[in-house]
């Protein structure tokens, strides 16, 4: 029912958009040459950390992206983002975001915004480009990889911004809160696969990974199993355009219940706190750090299947003219803290590791960009005892991307 509602809304807003005269249509094509020694990718049913594994060497489609924006009125805008990865998902081209945004004209130093639809929570300071992409690296940090895999706000978000700098103050402040549904499955991938580092976003009507192979074939994301709204609330501050901070608390408020046949799993109750800082001391340098810590658990049995998870990263980027160089260090950990299977397997599951990412980008022309990225990810994953792989692995991946944006 929820997916039918989203599809009906999609058709309705696109019909409304068709009546508008002015619109923006973006096209992005990303082609890559890949070399990897990584273990079987998490996107193909394995426990590797990276998007591509040792069987994926050669030319690959990074993505084909379409973005659509139209101003329906002076204060109302519609945004749609669609993407194709060429990895045989349920739909060859699928939506990642679709929402309407209302920004009433500010009559004072306070400005409101209301978003309704399906969109990303404003947690990331890294993924700043249209299509929720990063200008710094090809692969997202572990934190934002997970956001792209399992989190989407399907509901409404209200923001209230104090325009302090327009009034001569040193800072702007923003407060936001959202209510959402269709995210009772958040935590499924984190518990079963651990953290990852890639840029493959889950789509609104798709399955995780290649044709749903990484999880059971019928596993669907973004489903509403308990008819109970989740929420998040946060605040952001921007000091003179030099320092930006974001703080969020997220809770999907999933009601625990037995296995649901729609996902062949239980609903997962997931909550976390996130703090991010972005510092731009000069026109050339950008420093970003983000921290996220939370818990997720399922099962109506006792003890519950419970996990604690956290990750943090530090990214430094230098840009001058057509060149940009970026480096990022990630730490990540997820640890099972309770299990109703402990009597059978004798140990708790978990994932612990760190990764280095280096990237260099050159803008070749107005529409063409070349990006070279290398990742080394070290991880120890207890679940690998079931696949016969070494528990501790060092995985490396190189990608050379040629990107067209218009």
Language-model segments: what does each one mean?
Residues 24, 103-114, 149-314:
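Signature for the C-terminal beta-barrel architecture of outer-membrane proteins
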Residues 53, 99-102, 118, 242-406:
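Outer-membrane beta-barrel pore domains
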Residues 1-4:
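Positively charged n-region of N-terminal signal peptides that target proteins for export
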Residues 7-17:
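Bacterial N-terminal signal peptides
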Residues 23-36, 55-192, 236-243, 315-337:
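Outer membrane beta-barrel
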Residues 34-62, 220, 260-261:
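Surface-exposed strand-loop-strand hairpins of Gram-negative outer-membrane beta-barrel proteins
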Residues 18-22:
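Sec/Tat signal peptide C-region and signal peptidase I cleavage site
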Residues 60-63, 79-81, 94-97, 151-155, ...:
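Transmembrane beta-barrel architecture of outer-membrane proteins
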């Amino acid at each position: 029912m929820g997916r039918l509602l989203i599809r009906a809304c999609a058709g309705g807003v696109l019909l409304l958009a068709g009546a508008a005269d002015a619109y923006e249509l973006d096209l992005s094509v990303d082609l890559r040459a890949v070399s990897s020694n990584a273990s079987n990718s998490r996107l193909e049913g394995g426990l590797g950390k990276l998007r591509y594994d040792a069987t994926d060497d050669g030319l690959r489609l990074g993505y084909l992206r379409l973005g659509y924006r139209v101003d329906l009125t002076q204060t109302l805008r519609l945004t749609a983002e669609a993407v194709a990865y060429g990895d045989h998902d349920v739909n060859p081209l699928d939506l990642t975001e679709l929402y309407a945004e209302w920004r009433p004209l500010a009559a004072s130093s306070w400005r409101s915004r209301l978003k309704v639809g399906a969109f990303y929570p404003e947690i990331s300071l890294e993924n700043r480009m249209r299509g929720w992409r990063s200008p710094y690296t090809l692969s997202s940090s572990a934190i934002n990889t997970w956001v792209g895999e399992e989190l989407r706000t399907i509901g409404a978000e209200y923001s209230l911004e104090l325009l302090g700098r327009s009034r001569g103050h040193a800072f702007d402040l923003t407060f936001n809160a959202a209510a959402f549904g269709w995210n009772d499955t958040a935590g499924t991938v984190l518990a079963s696969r651990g953290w990852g580092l890639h840029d493959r976003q889950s789509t609104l009507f798709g399955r995780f990974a290649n044709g749903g192979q990484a999880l059971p074939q019928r596993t669907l994301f973004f489903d509403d199993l308990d008819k109970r709204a989740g929420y998040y609330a946060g605040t952001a501050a921007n000091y003179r355009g030099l320092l930006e901070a974001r703080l969020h608390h997220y809770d999907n408020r999933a009601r625990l219940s037995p296995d649901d046949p729609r996902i062949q799993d239980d609903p997962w109750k997931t909550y976390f706190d996130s703090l991010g800082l972005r510092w731009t001391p000069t026109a050339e340098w950008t420093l970003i750090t983000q921290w996220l810590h939370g818990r997720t658990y399922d099962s109506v049995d006792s003890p519950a299947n419970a996990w604690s998870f956290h990750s943090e990263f530090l990214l430094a980027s230098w840009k001058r003219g057509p060149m940009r160089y970026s480096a990022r260090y990630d730490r990540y950990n997820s640890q099972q803290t309770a299990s109703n299977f402990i009597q059978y397997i004798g140990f708790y599951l978990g994932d612990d590791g760190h990764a280095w990412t280096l990237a260099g980008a050159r803008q070749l022309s107005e529409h063409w960009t070349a990006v070279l990225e290398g990742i080394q990810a070290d991880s120890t994953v207890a679940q690998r005892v079931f696949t016969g792989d070494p528990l501790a692995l060092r995985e490396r991946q190189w990608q050379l991307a040629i990107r067209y944006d218009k």
